[in-house]
Design a protein with these regions (language model features):
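Short conserved segment of the HATPase_c
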Residues: 223-237
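Membrane-proximal HAMP signal-relay module
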Residues: 5-9, 13-72, 87-94, 129, ...
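Conserved micro-motifs of the catalytic ATP-binding
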Residues: 131-136, 168, 172-178
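A conserved beta-strand-to-alpha-helix junction within the catalytic ATP-binding
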Residues: 37, 41, 136-151, 164
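Acidic ATP/Mg2+-coordinating residue in the GHKL
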Residues: 218
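Short helix-loop "hinge" at the ATP-lid/N-box region of the Bergerat-fold HATPase_c
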Residues: 190-192
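Short alpha-helical segment of the dimerization/phosphotransfer core of two-component systems
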Residues: 112-117
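Short conserved segments within the C-terminal catalytic ATPase subdomain
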Residues: 156-165
Length: 293
């Protein structure tokens, strides 16, 4: 009996040693399955519990690292447009003879975009990292948000021979204007990446019943039906080679979904290959009386 017990103990020892090697080489799912009803089974259970803890900790570490990478990608993507605007207007001041009014206008754009950059960076930090901080929404005319975006993006799009037009009627919605402008910027920027030559992006806004509806339409290359349901997923790209060439982390539309959720808004995508894309944003419109109460 002692000989059999010793052999059994050696067998268990070898299995424990083998399991430890598996775990040390990254196989965190390896486990011992022993049902002997004695202290050896208890030892195996202790070892399995230890392996469970290691696997959980490693998974949590990987998840945390992935979230950090996503945040850095999102952050860089979101700050690109205001930074481009600031650099563009600063370059105008540096390289061209401008009138006093033009100089003041460019300086005001640089200042306002710098302040927006400061505000947006803090809000994105809350949105993407903290997530549990409540966003403060105030009554705002969505046409103002669109107009601000048009003023910032129009000069840069013109350099790429893309015309940006807008026709928005006045409304009143509960919103965080910085975050909502980020939503509009992301959608327009996504349209830009889908346009080859002689591009046109049109932004229209109007009140429909109890909603304010913003429609962003482009004449780009469009998307196949199977891609539409996936375009708001983080890191998903319709044309990965094009996206790498033009920059961006692939998180813009995923952020749009988060911002829309904060504003109780709905985003609908309609597209066809070769015919462009239409993005419809619908958000609650409050009455003017409520705005002045």
């Amino acid at each position: 009996h002692l000989s059999l017990r010793r052999q059994r103990q050696m067998c268990i020892r070898d299995r424990l040693s083998s399991l430890a090697q598996h775990i040390s080489h990254g196989d965190y799912s390896a486990r011992l399955h022993i049902h002997s009803g004695d202290e050896i089974e208890a030892l195996a259970n202790d070892f399995n519990n230890m392996a469970d803890t290691i696997e959980d900790n490693i998974s949590e570490l990987h998840f945390s690292m992935e979230k950090q990478e996503q945040f850095m990608g999102s952050f860089a993507h979101e700050l690109k447009t205001p930074m481009t605007s600031i650099i563009g207007y600063a370059d105008l001041l540096r390289s061209q003879n401008m009138s006093e009014d033009e100089t003041n206008e460019a300086a005001n754009y640089i200042f306002s975009e710098g302040k927006r950059l400061e505000s947006l960076s803090l809000k994105l930090l809350d949105l993407l990292v903290v997530k549990n901080q409540e966003t403060i929404l105030t009554p705002t005319d969505p046409a103002l948000a669109v107009r601000n975006v048009i003023n910032v993006m129009k000069p840069e799009l013109a350099k790429e021979h893309i015309t940006l037009k807008s026709s928005c009627r006045k409304g009143c919605c509960m919103m965080d204007i910085d975050l909502f402008q980020s939503l509009i910027i992301n959608i327009i920027d996504n349209a830009r990446k889908a346009i080859d030559d002689n591009g046109l992006i049109h932004v229209a806004g109007t009140v429909r019943d109890d909603n304010y509806v913003i429609i962003i339409k482009d004449n780009g290359r469009g998307m196949p039906p199977e891609e539409i349901t996936r375009i708001s997923e983080a890191f998903y790209r319709i044309d990965k080679s094009r996206s790498r060439a033009q920059g961006g982390a692939g998180l813009g539309l995923a952020i749009c979904s988060k911002i829309a959720e904060i504003h109780q808004a709905k985003i609908k995508y309609k597209s066809a290959v070769g015919r462009g894309t239409v993005v419809t944003i619908t958000l609650p419109n409050i009455k003017e009386a409520a705005h002045h109460e």
